């Protein structure tokens, strides 16, 4: 069956960009002076930017989870030992400079930045609705900032490219300092913070980035930099002024199809099957579900660790929506989950799509959105920033809001007709936190982020900005007597290596990170 790419943000319009554009392997590209003349040209270019985060095989989403979770104490690589061996290198901190997953991350994010630069450079002079063109420019700035944030937090300083350039020109650009990259990110996101709110877009544009996305990424940037003062101000704006978001009443709702792009969702990648005879949607759930259940065709990657499981209170109902277990059976499935090939006995609930919720004739392409940022993330960042700014009473308010929602979550999953384990949740489960001790509250908030956002790709980000990545990983290795984490070197492993292929193309103008 011929694979057809559908427009990510136009929600039904076939994208007319050529395959050479979509598959471009490097981070420089030739642009045509005659192309970006009309509003429709800019819209098409912006759609091309969004598509870098959602191509047919969803390599960005896979990379997001492999880097963000599998290189931490939350997730094992999973699958068979030889399958995607480069992810095992990430997991064990034995990463070579030729690692395919590392190179893939670099390529995808620079393709995203490239497309954004085309929009930003040409939108101001294009013919059409000037207000709409200005919005397109701000969307591109928000996406470019997301790309650079994802690069600088994993590679450190990188080439800072803010205008369309030829490949030959790109190859002469050295790495900018991390400070310079962060300055550009903050500038872009500050400008994009005046984008429309989540509810102000037309239905056909409901997945476009919003002011909430821009402000959330701005807050994450400040938090990563340890600038809690500015982070608090931005987060206060999101939570107390804009009020564009809220928590769903039940934690488990976040992964049910009827709640896609819900009031809690700040950013997600849509993967819709519009025509059951055309292979669209996403294949990520197949990578992350069990290899032993007919109809799932899973590869068994992204396996929750025992350490993550042990981080939960025994009566915390969120366990139901983080771990699938042998014996769980979803309504409509003929067979219960069988996780005997999983090293921990668990698989990733948040990427499990049962038969009753699948659409299309191609079982590899599932109508399922990738949830990247939720409002509970913002509330916990806000609690953390407030605590660091010596406002523990305010911090507890937002921490306890997240815990209250968890406490009131149904521990019995309505998507299942058999559930191997049901937490004994009561009204006294996850009681409100009362301490006002700054150090104690910090540890509690960090723990709450882990169990609330488990398997959602943000664990590495948290451990890095908390300056305890090595400490946590070495403790993990010692606790379980495993290789994972034992090799962690603080001078090396906070950053990934600059891909050797990119260094070769630049004639080593791109310098390498320490100890690689």
Language-model regions, residue ranges each:
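Bacterial Sec-dependent N-terminal signal peptides
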Residues: 1-28
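Long, intrinsically disordered, low-complexity segments
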Residues: 20-24, 50, 74-81, 95-99, ...
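Conserved, well-structured interaction surfaces
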Residues: 43-47, 51-57, 81-155, 176-180, ...
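Flexible, polar/acidic helix-loop-strand segments at domain edges
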Residues: 84-94, 310-375
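Structural register within alpha-helical repeat arrays
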Residues: 144, 211, 218, 375, ...
């Amino acid at each position: 069956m011929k694979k057809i790419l559908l427009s990510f943000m136009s929600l039904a319009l076939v994208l007319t960009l050529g395959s050479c554009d979509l598959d471009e392997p490097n981070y420089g590209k030739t642009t045509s002076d005659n192309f970006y003349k009309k509003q429709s040209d800019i819209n098409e270019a912006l759609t091309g930017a969004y598509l870098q985060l959602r191509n047919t095989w969803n390599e960005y989403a896979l990379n997001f989870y492999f880097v963000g979770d599998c290189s931490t104490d939350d997730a094992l690589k999973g699958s068979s030992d030889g399958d995607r061996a480069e992810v095992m290198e990430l997991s064990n901190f034995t990463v070579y400079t030729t690692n395919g997953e590392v190179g893939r991350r670099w390529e995808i994010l620079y393709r995203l930045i490239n497309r954004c630069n085309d929009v930003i450079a040409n939108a101001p002079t294009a013919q059409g609705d000037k207000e709409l063109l200005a919005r397109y420019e701000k969307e591109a700035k928000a996406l470019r900032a997301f790309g650079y944030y994802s690069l600088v937090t994993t590679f450190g300083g990188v080439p800072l490219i803010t205008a369309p350039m030829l490949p030959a020109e790109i190859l002469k650009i050295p790495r900018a300092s991390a400070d310079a990259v962060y300055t550009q990110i903050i500038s872009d996101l500050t400008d994009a913070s005046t984008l429309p709110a989540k509810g102000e877009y037309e239905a056909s544009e409901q997945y476009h980035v919003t002011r909430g996305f821009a402000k959330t990424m701005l807050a994450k940037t400040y938090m990563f930099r340890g600038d809690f003062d500015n982070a608090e101000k931005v987060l206060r704006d999101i939570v107390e002024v804009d009020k564009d978001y809220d928590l769903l009443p039940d934690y488990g709702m976040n992964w049910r199809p009827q709640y896609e792009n819900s009031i809690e969702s700040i950013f997600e990648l849509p993967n819709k099957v519009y025509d059951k005879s055309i292979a669209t949607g996403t294949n990520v759930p197949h990578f992350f579900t069990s290899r032993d259940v007919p109809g799932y065709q899973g590869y068994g990657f992204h396996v929750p660790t025992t350490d993550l499981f042990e981080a939960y209170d025994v009566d915390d109902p969120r366990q139901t929506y983080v771990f699938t277990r042998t014996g769980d059976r979803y309504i409509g499935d003929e067979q219960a989950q069988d996780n005997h090939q999983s090293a921990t006995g668990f698989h990733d609930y948040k990427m499990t799509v049962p038969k009753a919720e699948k659409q299309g004739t191609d079982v590899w392409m599932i109508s399922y959105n990738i949830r990247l940022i939720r409002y509970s993330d913002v509330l916990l960042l806000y609690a953390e920033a407030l605590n660091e700014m010596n406002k523990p009473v305010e911090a507890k308010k937002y921490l306890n809001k997240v815990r209250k929602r968890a406490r009131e979550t149904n521990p019995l999953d309505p998507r299942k007709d058999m559930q191997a384990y049901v937490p004994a949740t009561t009204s006294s489960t996850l009681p409100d936190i009362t301490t006002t001790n700054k150090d104690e509250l910090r540890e509690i908030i960090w723990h709450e982020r882990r169990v609330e956002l488990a398997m959602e790709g943000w664990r590495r980000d948290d451990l890095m900005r908390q300056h305890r990545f090595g400490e946590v990983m070495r403790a993990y290795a010692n606790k379980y007597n495993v290789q994972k984490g034992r090799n962690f070197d603080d001078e090396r492993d906070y950053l990934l290596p600059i891909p050797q292929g990119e260094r070769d193309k630049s004639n080593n103008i791109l310098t390498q990170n320490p100890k690689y």
